[in-house]
């Protein structure tokens, strides 16, 4: 970090050299991201171990559940998150008649394990925990392509999950 030079102290503000593949520091403002650090304990239960990722409306952290003695993903939303994801995920996990083959996609929709709020300097942040995913497909496929059988199975699973979402009246807005 360096400082912008100006005629007086009021014109001096920090200039940050951006790092790729991380959220913007400018989003750590009221209404934005909640500051989380490795070692923090969230909700008197989840000890933060590492950062898993981020999106436009959240950061995701690997944490140890100190009660159940297992690892979970903790998603910490921004104050201004447009929707409560947990409401949608819980609704999607409830039994409802959906035509086949879309009904097969229900297995791919995770259910939240716990839901809570964090109060911080930027506001009140919605949070929830999930079971950890097996791996990050983008990272795994970066070094080499999947065998065709694996690629077909993964693609088929995504298609079934999206078909299930659509059959339930939802559309996923964050797909590349």
Q: Where are the model-predicted features located?
A:
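Active-site beta-strand termini and strand-to-loop segments that position acidic
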Residues: 44, 63-66
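Protein kinase glycine-rich loop
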Residues: 48-55, 60
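Conserved alphaE helix
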Residues: 124, 134-176
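Conserved hydrophobic/aromatic residues on the N-lobe beta-strands of protein kinase domains
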Residues: 73, 127-129
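Juxta-kinase regulatory segment immediately upstream of eukaryotic protein kinase catalytic domains
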Residues: 1-41
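Residues forming the ATP-binding cleft of Hanks-type serine/threonine protein kinase domains
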Residues: 52, 77, 113-119, 133, ...
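Short beta-strand micro-motifs within the conserved protein kinase catalytic domain, predominantly
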Residues: 99-126
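ATP-binding glycine-rich loop module of kinase domains
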Residues: 65-94, 99
């Amino acid at each position: 970090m360096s400082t912008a030079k100006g005629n007086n102290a009021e014109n001096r503000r920090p200039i940050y050299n951006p790092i790729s593949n991380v959220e913007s520091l400018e989003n750590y403002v009221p209404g934005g991201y909640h500051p989380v650090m490795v070692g923090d304990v969230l909700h008197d239960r989840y000890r933060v171990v590492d950062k898993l990722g981020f999106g436009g409306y959240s950061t995701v952290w690997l944490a140890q559940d100190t009660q159940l003695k297992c690892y979970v993903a903790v998603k910490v939303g921004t104050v201004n998150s447009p929707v409560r994801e947990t409401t949608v995920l819980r609704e999607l996990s409830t039994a409802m008649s959906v035509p086949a083959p879309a009904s097969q996609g229900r297995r791919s929709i995770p259910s939240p394990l716990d839901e809570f709020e964090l109060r911080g300097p930027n506001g009140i942040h919605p949070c929830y925990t999930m079971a950890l995913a097996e791996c990050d497909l983008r990272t795994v496929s970066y070094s080499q392509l999947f065998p065709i059988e694996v690629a077909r199975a993964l693609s088929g699973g995504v298609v079934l999950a999206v078909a299930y979402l659509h059959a339930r009246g939802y559309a996923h807005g964050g797909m590349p």
